[in-house]
């Protein structure tokens, strides 16, 4: 219940500033905050992609070793290891 009252008060406060001619300043500040958040998220995604590129050789090697222990051939695609039997015997 307290959250609803807080958000109602926040809406009233924002609308009061908007009516007072400060609408563009508030909107600019909100846009800047969302822009910074977007940049941080995109940087995090880029870091995650870089880590996955570094991790692929380790996962490929693990997959090959895992399948070799089963006397199969290992193939790793998109972090999914699949063991394939060669030869039909």
Swiss-Prot record:
Gene Ontology molecular function: potassium channel regulator activity; toxin activity
Family stated for the protein in its record: Belongs to the long chain scorpion toxin family. Class 2 subfamily.
UniProt note on tissues of expression: Expressed by the venom gland.
Main localization of the protein described in the UniProt heading: secreted
Keyword Transmembrane found: no
Sorted UniProt keywords: Disulfide bond, Ion channel impairing toxin, Neurotoxin, Potassium channel impairing toxin, Secreted, Signal, Toxin
Positions of the pro-segment in this chain: 21-39
rRNA-binding found in the keyword field: no
N-terminal signal peptide: 1-20
Official protein name in the record: Neurotoxin beta-KTx 12
Disulfide bonds: 56-76, 63-81, 67-83
Subcellular location: Secreted
Summary of the function given for this chain in its UniProt record: Inhibits voltage-gated potassium channel.
């Amino acid at each position: 219940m307290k959250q609803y009252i807080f958000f109602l008060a926040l809406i009233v406060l924002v609308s009061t500033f908007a009516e007072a001619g400060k609408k563009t300043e508030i909107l600019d500040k909100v846009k800047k905050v969302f822009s910074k958040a977007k940049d941080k998220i995109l940087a995090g995604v880029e870091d995650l992609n870089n880590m996955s590129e570094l991790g692929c050789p380790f996962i490929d090697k693990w997959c090959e070793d895992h399948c070799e222990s089963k006397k199969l051939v290992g193939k790793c695609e998109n972090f999914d290891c699949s063991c394939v039997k060669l030869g039909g015997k």
